[in-house]
Amino acid sequence: MTKIKVANPIVEMDGDEQTRIIWHLIRDKLVLPYLDVDLKYYDLSVEYRDQTNDQVTVDSATATLKYGVAVKCATITPDEARVEEFHLKKMWKSPNGTIRNILGGTVFREPIIIPRIPRLVPQWEKPIIIGRHAFGDQYKATDVIVPEEGELRLVYKSKSGTHDVDLKVFDYPEHGGVAMMMYNTTDSIEGFAKASFELAIERKLPLYSTTKNTILKKYDGKFKDVFEAMYARSYKEKFESLGIWYEHRLIDDMVAQMLKSKGGYIIAMKNYDGDVESDIVAQGFGSLGLMTSVLITPDGKTFESEAAHGTVTRHFRQHQQGKETSTNSIASIFAWTRGIIQRGKLDNTPDVVKFGQILESATVNTVQEDGIMTKDLALILGKSERSAYVTTEEFIDAVESRLKKEFEAAAL
């Protein structure tokens, strides 16, 4: 079998625990036998991040800016227990957060719909894509414990000295409390809006943006104003010609409407809102194991894809004890395929794009047509008997078998 040549490199970011095991199986069984691809490898395991003082995370993001496409395995974000478990030098920051802050851009999370798998929200027939602004707000905030009575002030020193701000925020009573300062930038909000409008055009789906501008009149009002100005200036005519629309909604109203809808739209959300709501949407469509996550920069030139779930520690503990596991690898497979498809689009190599699509089709059809699935999906179908599901490895082997047939039939 002749391998398909991938014109330019893909950055590969390895990860932790059970997803690391899955990642290697996918790469070695489903990707490398079919593609002649230069993978620029970075080990983002928590041990190696610690060894390099997290420099490897920065290096992987820099490489992504250079080559344009990255695929990422799930990684551990250490807490106190993890620092102790791995004897880490310190509690390193979330690698996803570090990468997002270097790349900028917007994280779009989209469900993988398999008709056989029932949805918790049954009327969601079409995808709901959550666009999460991947910069600033709570994720780059400075927060403090206020130990005693005192005054909190908000101070901004402008470079020119003509727009300084010094505002009294609050007088703390005797026992103090907590305080937080967060920020965003006009450039980043504009980039977020552009990426959202561009995806809506590409997917021919209506776009909603959400804020709580009734409460945060200036902070959230800025997001609302940027989106509306950009839509009127650059996108209104394009949207109307495609029969789609843009609308701003209050976050609470949008969430309520979302539950009643049939799906089929994109919602652009601020960083925290998008973090929370994308998990709700994933569960509503069936499982976090059926959710893609891609980060796209506003110019569309830099792209990073990953699974939307964590490292599946519970299954990894079973694996360490020599017990069988049944871990859903679908989102990790799609992390690879979305990166492969994007690489093919950027390089204008249709065979690479087609291979990514065939691997996605083979993965979905392994469940949909062959009825082969991991335990989490069998449980959604109400089946807990051992014969209803396969092991982690058996599922990937079943996808491999189906991929061979679909690949040969496509005659690439």
Swiss-Prot record:
Q: What is the UniProt remark on how the cofactor binds and its stoichiometry?
A: Binds 1 Mg(2+) or Mn(2+) ion per subunit.
- Broad enzyme group: oxidoreductase
Binding-site residues, Mn(2+): 252, 275
Q: Which domain of life is it from?
A: Eukaryota
Q: Which residues does this entry assign to the site Critical for catalysis?
A: 139, 212
For the ligand (NADP(+)), the binding residues are 75-77, 82, 260, 310-315, 328
* ATP-binding is among the record's keywords: no
Instruction: Give the EC number.
Output: 1.1.1.42
| Keyword Cytoplasm found | yes
Q: Which Pfam families match?
A: Iso_dh
Record's family?
Belongs to the isocitrate and isopropylmalate dehydrogenases family.
Additional comments on file? Answer: Present with 2620 molecules/cell in log phase SD medium.
According to UniProt, the name of this protein is Isocitrate dehydrogenase [NADP] cytoplasmic
Organism in which the protein naturally occurs: Saccharomyces cerevisiae (strain ATCC 204508 / S288c) (Baker's yeast)
Q: What is the lineage of its organism?
A: Eukaryota, Fungi, Dikarya, Ascomycota, Saccharomycotina
Q: Which gene encodes it?
A: IDP2
